[in-house]
């Protein structure tokens, strides 16, 4: 059994994206996989059990057999936090070691850390505490957001030494890709850090379901409720002159247009282009002809009481931060990893 920790020093770097993409490719090659998420922050009620939503969907997509509770070591809650502060034992480390033992028949077990190398320290289950204990190797997953992300990778080298397999750099914007390849990667390689993959930001993987948007802005759906499982890839604010709106909207596919309820001119133009939904801010109700046209075009209209700025701010918090649980997103992850990840090199050194 090869235990592989996927760790990062900041949230939403895409650790489970790599587990899914790499995992689906390895399954295709005949490998038996295991999966454990160290700390769950997405409580999800399934029948009478509280489990971690992300861990559940990853295990389902990878078709890993076992009870739902076998895929997440510890789920954070207010009660758990209080017990930690009262120095009460929660047996998190014991539970983790039991989960590892349950998956000892696997070829590779992916263990996903939290939002930093030290998260879980108070429970005894941070990556820093566990890597040596179970003789694991480490893969660092970092997003490219600024040059200081290099420090996180160098820190992992310092902390985990020969246990570090290398790193992957995720969510690189198109205009910085060549810079990362030609400057960042050589710098890290000189310091004996393998780079297995550089992945560009992907519109499909960053896309958000309309139902999640509604939830985040406390919205009310006016029409076309059957379309709320559709995905939005782009967001545009419709605050311009109508004469400019069409050329602005037509360049951006699969979008949500955010505008005021009084801007029926913008709403009509948005519906003539590739628009997934229209979000009306300020709590105003759209005019009846607009609702009729939206029904004809099968475009949901959502109303929120938030102003435009607050609406955009809330939606931005969702982008790239939702759980991958849809088959088409998992398949996209598989395709990207197949093309961009040095799978053979990875398998040789684990």
Please provide the spans of the model-predicted regions.
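Non-catalytic interface/targeting segments
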Residues: 113, 198-259, 315-350
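Fold-independent oxyanion-binding glycine-rich loops
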Residues: 8-10, 38-39, 71, 112-115, ...
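Phosphate-binding/switch loop-helix module in NTP-utilizing enzymes
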Residues: 81-123, 128-132
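N-terminal phosphate/diphosphate-binding loop that engages ATP/GTP or pyrophosphate donors
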Residues: 7-90
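Conserved catalytic-core segment of NTP-binding enzymes
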Residues: 114-194, 262-298, 302-324
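Ligand-binding beta-strand-loop-alpha-helix segment within the catalytic cores
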Residues: 73-78, 82, 87-90, 186-206
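Short, high-confidence coil segments that cap the C-terminus of an alpha-helix
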Residues: 31-32, 104-107, 254, 275
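Extreme N-terminal starter segment of soluble prokaryotic enzymes
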Residues: 1-5
């Amino acid at each position: 059994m090869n235990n592989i920790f996927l760790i990062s020093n900041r949230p939403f770097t895409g650790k489970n994206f790599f587990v899914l993409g790499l995992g689906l490719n390895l399954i295709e090659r005949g490998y038996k996989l295991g999966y454990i998420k160290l700390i769950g922050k997405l409580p999800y009620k399934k029948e009478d059990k509280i489990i971690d939503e992300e861990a559940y969907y990853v295990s389902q997509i990878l078709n890993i057999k076992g009870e739902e509770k076998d895929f997440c070591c510890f789920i954070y809650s207010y009660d758990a936090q209080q017990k930690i502060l009262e120095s009460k034992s929660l047996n998190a480390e014991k539970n983790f070691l039991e989960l590892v033992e349950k998956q000892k028949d696997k070829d590779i077990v992916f263990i996903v850390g939290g939002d930093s190398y030290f998260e879980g320290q108070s429970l005894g289950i941070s990556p820093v505490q566990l890597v040596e204990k179970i003789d694991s190797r480490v893969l660092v997953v970092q997003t490219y957001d600024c040059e200081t992300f290099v420090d996180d990778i160098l820190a992992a080298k310092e902390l985990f030494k020969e246990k570090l397999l290398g790193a992957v750099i995720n969510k690189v914007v198109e205009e910085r890709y060549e810079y990362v390849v030609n400057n960042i990667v050589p710098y890290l390689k000189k310091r004996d850090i393998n780079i297995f993959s550089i992945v560009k930001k992907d519109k499909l993987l960053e896309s958000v379901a309309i139902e999640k948007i509604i939830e985040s802005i406390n919205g009310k759906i006016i029409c076309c409720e059957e379309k709320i499982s559709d995905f939005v890839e782009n967001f545009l604010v419709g605050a311009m002159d109508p004469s400019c709106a069409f050329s602005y909207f037509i360049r951006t596919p699969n979008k949500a247009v955010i505008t005021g309820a009084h801007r029926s001119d913008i709403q009509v133009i948005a519906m003539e282009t590739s628009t997934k939904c229209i979000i009306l801010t300020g709590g105003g109700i759209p005019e009846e002809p607009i609702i009729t046209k939206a029904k004809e075009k099968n475009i949901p209209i959502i109303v929120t009481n938030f102003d435009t700025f607050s609406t955009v701010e809330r939606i931005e918090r969702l982008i790239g931060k939702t759980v991958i649980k849809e088959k088409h997103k998992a398949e996209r992850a598989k395709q990207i990893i197949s093309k961009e990840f040095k799978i053979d090199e990875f398998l040789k050194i684990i």
